[in-house]
Amino acid sequence: GYTWADSAPVVSLLETLEALTEYQRAGKIRYIGVSNETAFGVMRYLHLADKHDLPRIVTIQNPYSLVNRSYEVALAEVSQFEGVELLAYSCLAFGTLTGKYLNGAKPAGARNTLFSRFTRYSGEQTQKAVAAYVDIAKRHNLDPAQMALAFVRL
């Protein structure tokens, strides 16, 4: 696990937002977004932008898939009401939603074969869910990966 070090340098959210504003005004970036942020963090950025007349963040890049729906807990509400769009990543859950790892399969060259420490999507519950999703896809003549990506596009 991660151990917080009180002596670690911290850059305030306001200072970060001011620096990004300078880049935007200089034409080096068009918009400001965040990645792997919480609903609280997004709302703090938005509050500071409004309070100090700075550009608001417009995107959040977080994981989102059929088997990782944590975005829906609070961030979806922030996105809807504050206009902060999701740029989803890990939409195939490290390739798990393709079905290629079902029944303990370890395809040569596949991410979970090469990097076995990535076990986030290898648990029993996830494997059961993936098997059900793959079954649904096959019954409807869909590619499991296409079905998983279509879910994220909704």
PLM feature spans:
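Glycine-rich beta-alpha junction loops
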Residues: 38, 64-68, 90-97, 151
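Aromatic-lined glycan-binding groove of carbohydrate-active enzymes
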Residues: 71-110, 142-143
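Conserved, mostly hydrophobic/aromatic
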Residues: 32, 60, 79, 86-89, ...
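Hydrophobic packing residues within well-ordered alpha-helices of enzyme cores
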Residues: 42-45, 79, 97, 152
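Glycine/proline-rich, positively charged
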Residues: 1-67
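Conserved short secondary-structure transition element at the edge of the structured enzyme core
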Residues: 24, 91, 113, 119-154
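Soluble or luminal CAZymes and related metallo-dependent hydrolases
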Residues: 12-16, 37, 71, 125-129, ...
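Surface-exposed amphipathic alpha-helices with a cationic face
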Residues: 21-24, 46-49, 76-80, 134-138
